[in-house]
Structures are given as structure tokens and as C-alpha cells.
Amino acid sequence: MGVHDGHRERRRALFRRCGEDAFADHELLEVLLFYAIPRKDTNPIAHALIDQFGSLQAVLAASPEELESVPEVGPSASTLIALVSALSRKALTSAASGEVVLDTRAR
């Protein structure tokens, strides 16, 4: 067993226990990338994204094409990041408008 065995599960468990405050920005991005990049160390990729774009906010604002300019970021990772960003914007917009959706079929 290597030192990195179980790393992903430990990171997921820490997030479930403690939330985002237990993580630096690149660490949150690293955990997100677990779901799009199953067999690579996502820590250096997360660092590369933050380094290229300057901040987590800028990473989330980047287009999939811009994200894919970072080595090892392919369509799955860029789509996941763009999807998380879109979901966040949609939720914030709904919260700001005071809109409450009880039944999505009613729209």
C-alpha cells in the first residue's frame, strides 16, 4: 500500500465532515476534478488551473475552451467545472430573486 492509497476517499470524507472551510481553493478544485479525472493525481492539475487563471473565481468563470488550454484538462473536466459554475449562478440568481420553486413541472 502506498502513501496515497485512500487519498481521494479521505478528501471526500473530510469535505462531508467539515465542508469547504477545511480546504484551500486548489484543494476544493482537486476534489471536484476527482469526478472527471479518475486515474490521475488531480492536485497538480488544480494548481495549474489556479496558476493560469489567477483564482478559483476566474477558473469558474472560464469557458470550457479556455479551461482545456491547461494540460490534462479535457472535455470531461472542463464540462464539469462549467456545470458547477452554471449551477452556482442559477442557484444564486434564484436566491436573489426570492424565487421558490416547489414543483419544477409548474414552470
Task: Please give the residue ranges for each predicted region.
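Short alpha-helical scaffolding segments that buttress acidic/His motifs in well-ordered protein cores
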Residues: 27-33, 46-49, 81-84
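Catalytic cores of large soluble enzymes that bind and process phosphate-bearing ligands
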Residues: 3, 7, 41, 100-104
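Charged, compositionally biased N-terminal leader segments and the immediate start
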Residues: 1-32
